[in-house]
């Protein structure tokens, strides 16, 4: 039911994404073998999730303003950004100080955070936001 403002839809996306990512964190982080790894801390997950949702909401507002079919365009942009968001995770071992000690399972978990956030955010913004009045 499309009845919310972008702001409310973004808040729903934010809460849903944070909850999903924290569930993933608490279930799977112990299996990664990574201790004291800031991206796998609750605060790190919350901060990076909030940044992603905030950025997506801004992009959706812009796309919605200028596109005749904002849902399709935003979904495509989101898919491209999701794939690009994997690059820092993939290259973390080479780029970060101490990254060579990062486990593959930790990197996969970071990618899972991106996917969960993207799915929830795209759904909330495109399905819950009221149509733009011209």
Q: Which sequence ranges carry the predicted segments?
A:
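N-terminal signal-anchor transmembrane alpha-helix
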Residues: 1-31
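Alpha-helical transmembrane segments of multipass membrane proteins
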Residues: 16-25, 56, 60, 84-88, ...
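Membrane-helix boundary connector in multi-pass membrane proteins
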Residues: 89-108, 126
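Alpha-helical transmembrane segments of multi-pass integral membrane proteins
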Residues: 12-13, 47-49
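Non-cytosolic membrane-interface motifs at loop->transmembrane helix junctions
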Residues: 38-44, 99-112
């Amino acid at each position: 039911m499309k009845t919310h403002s972008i702001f409310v839809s973004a808040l729903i996306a934010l809460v849903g994404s944070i909850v999903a990512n924290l569930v993933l964190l608490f279930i799977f982080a112990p299996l990664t073998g990574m201790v004291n790894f800031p991206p796998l801390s609750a605060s790190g997950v919350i901060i990076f999730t909030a940044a992603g949702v905030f950025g997506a909401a801004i992009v959706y507002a812009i796309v919605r303003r200028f596109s005749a079919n904002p849902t399709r365009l935003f979904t495509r942009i989101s898919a491209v950004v999701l794939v690009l968001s994997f690059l820092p995770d993939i290259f973390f071992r080479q780029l970060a100080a101490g990254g060579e000690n990062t486990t593959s399972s930790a990197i996969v978990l970071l990618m899972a955070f991106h996917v969960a956030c993207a799915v929830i955010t795209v759904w909330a913004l495109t399905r819950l936001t009221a149509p733009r009045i011209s």
